[in-house]
Amino acid sequence: IEDSPRFSWRGQHLDCARHYYDVSSILRLLDLMSLLKLNRFHWHLIDDESFRLELSSVPELAVRTGMRGEGCTIPGVFGGSKGPTGGTYSAEDVSKILDHASSLGISVMPEIEIPAHSLALLKVFPEMRDPEDQSVEVSVQGYSENTINPAMPATWNFLKSVLPEISSLFPFGLIHLGCDELPPKVWERSPAIKKLMAEKNLKTTQDLLEWTMQRASNILVEEGARPAAWEEAASGDNGGIGNDALLFSWSGQEPGLKAAREGYEVVMCPAQHVYFDMAQTENPLDRGVSWAAIVSMEAALNWDPVPLKEPELEQNIIGIQGALWSETICNDKHMDTMLVPRILALSEVSWSSTLRKRSLPEFMGTVNHFSRVLNQLGWESYHLD
């Protein structure tokens, strides 16, 4: 049998910021990925709700934000037990996960979220905001003041400290910098920002965002690492983040297509097809959310990362990736039915060409058989009607 994958990047993301997953659960996910020929693990370690990664350069971050609950730095948002919940990942934990991933042929990309999604970071280092900023920004998740300020020297002192350390921990050499969901009205009333924009001849907030990402990515390049970011890092008209960054298109396919046309390499992860935190049916008892779509098995299977009318874009669209955000996850086992069996469709789309990909009725035979195999391996499957 001769077979080869359509895409080089066949990934799965896991949000360990909203819910802390035990190291054993991450190793278990890597085993599942290997079985399905998925070869990239996007490890989302940091967000508004926690900074899970223990770093020697800023040890207080994980100590103060790793646990959430009454009396903690971050209140008890999300979680599934009485009292403070959470945890952190040590250098030893990282090494164990990387070693196991490597043995399975899987590369690991960590993510640090900037400039937004930084509430936990700012709770510990408030000096990364302009004290004279009168902006009243609120994130789509409802958090106020969750965005670091690129005009503050403390912001760059922090990034110049932590990014080299993170790069040294993860030898794959690809570091995701975030860059999604900048809140409306952010920085608008910051005197320091107004001064910076005048000095750098930046006209819009998007210009400032892209300048910020360029400067942050320069730090990684100096360390010999390659930057990655969400689609917003190149959604303007001024070239974007640059630095050979790998972009992830999440809100739909069009932002990724735009970036691919502009020469960026892109991983497609549109929420309407591969966000596995989305509910699988309209049943109100279904776990999950639905702000992007109801992601059924059909939705996960029936899409093409590359438009038929633009086949030349396949040279820049290097793969696809599933995402499991963890706002609705209360214990590690909840991961099972959110992933299985939809992750099988992810594997199918990432491996097979459009001409070879099976129709839904054909594919369901494989799903039914393979779900039983996974059940024997300890993975609980969502029961499809």
Model-inferred region functions:
Residues S102-S103, P164, S168-P171, N218-A225, ...:
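Generic secondary-structure signature for well-ordered alpha-helical cores
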Residues E111-E113, E181, E232, E348:
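Acidic-residue sensor for enzyme active/binding pockets
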